[in-house]
Amino acid sequence: RGSSVFVLSERGATSSQARLLAQRENEADLVGGVNLGAKDLFLARTLLDLSQTATINDSLKLGKYLLGELGSINTLHKNNVEQASFAVLKAPDIPSALIETAFISNPDEERRLNDDAYQEKLAIAIVRGVRQYFSKHPPSPKNRLAALA
């Protein structure tokens, strides 16, 4: 019951729920590889690892803002950002988060998710969380085009 926010983990899932959800999501999606265009495989892997670590830290910050906003309109499943190895969260240069807004297996939450006003509250909470993150952590010059999108 409640909302959850997940970000990528380098060390595995923070809970059994996170691990199971990541396995299910990863089996459902095919993910293309990252082409760094480097001839030195070791260098390419090192650069990717460094970038991924920085992105995970940024994603954790983003997740905290999202949880703060979601917690103002919904019960939180957990008060902290969870981590798991979701294939869809592996972009090495863009903070990303997977948001579970509720559990449709819970009749009360399913009813709320079908309510237009509640959907709007969820959307506004997510937008606020993203805006808070970017207002405090603006993109570096190399990523300014992403901020315009």
Task: Give the location of each predicted region.
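Active-site-proximal helix/loop segments of hydrolytic enzymes
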Residues: 1-149
